[in-house]
Amino acid sequence: MALRICVTYTPALPIGLCTRCCLCLEQSPSWCHCLRGVSFLTFHLHQSVPLGDRDSLLMFTRQAGHFVEGSKAGRSRGRLCLSQALRVAVRGAFVSLWFAAGAGDRERNKGDKGAQTGAGLSQEAEDVDVSRARRVTDAPQGTLCGTGNRNSGSQSARVVGVAHLGEAFRVGVEQAISSCPEEVHGRHGLSMEIMWARMDVALRSPGRGLLAGAGALCMTLAESSCPDYERGRRACLTLHRHPTPHCSTWGLPLRVAGSWLTVVTVEALGGWRMGVRRTGQVGPTMHPPPVSGASPLLLHHLLLLLLIIILTC
């Protein structure tokens, strides 16, 4: 049944990825099997952007494969299985919001460049590529890589700079880190977690920005503590025989500490009033007003508590 549901409701995904997902589900108990199936379908059905172009399809496939692999790790039972299903569903919702925000930003960028010629756009794209290559090449050791990124149909550099790891908390909400090379100093897949930070600026919302920024930074810290670094959370969820403490020992404390450090540092520096303009410069942005009758600070802390529960249960 799960195989039939997966094939029926995930037409945009390659058959191989869908089959891997279903094979994973069939190895679990019946109720756990259903929970994981629902969580994966939630991830896909919330996808609101049509996957017509090759770039969007490639990105969606990579993200989907990343989350499916994370859900397969551990082969847990009982409440751990429920927590895995919840985490996959929440991460899927995050990615869906990321795609929706990217689609809106592409439309705004097209409107901003209405008076430019094709030659001008080509020159701008070339300048962005040269600048991006220079920043990636000159990145020092121990840094998070942020590069200029061009979406389909958009030639504007949205993100700039390379932030030192020690400054990651300070710039986590001010600077959207949209993309990195597949391999950052030998750590494969690190760009997947860094992409979460891009949603903070793309969504232009303090509450959602907290979830995105805290999730990106604390998960990056947790994964960076793994000496046996493989592929995303799979390395952190799989026990390794290693003479030194690895992610199964330090991952949970780092994730919790990273979440709290993110919100405390950003609140102290007034980071919720900062954002990244499409020109690549850090500056003030307009946020929507908070929900009437709700304290923004209290809302941030409640959302952070929910994030910690989901990541650590």
Curated annotation (Swiss-Prot):
Organism: Homo sapiens
Residue ranges, annotated region (Disordered): 107-129
Key word Ligase present: no
Keyword flag Coiled coil: no
Protein name (database record): Myeloma-overexpressed gene protein
Keywords of the record: Proto-oncogene
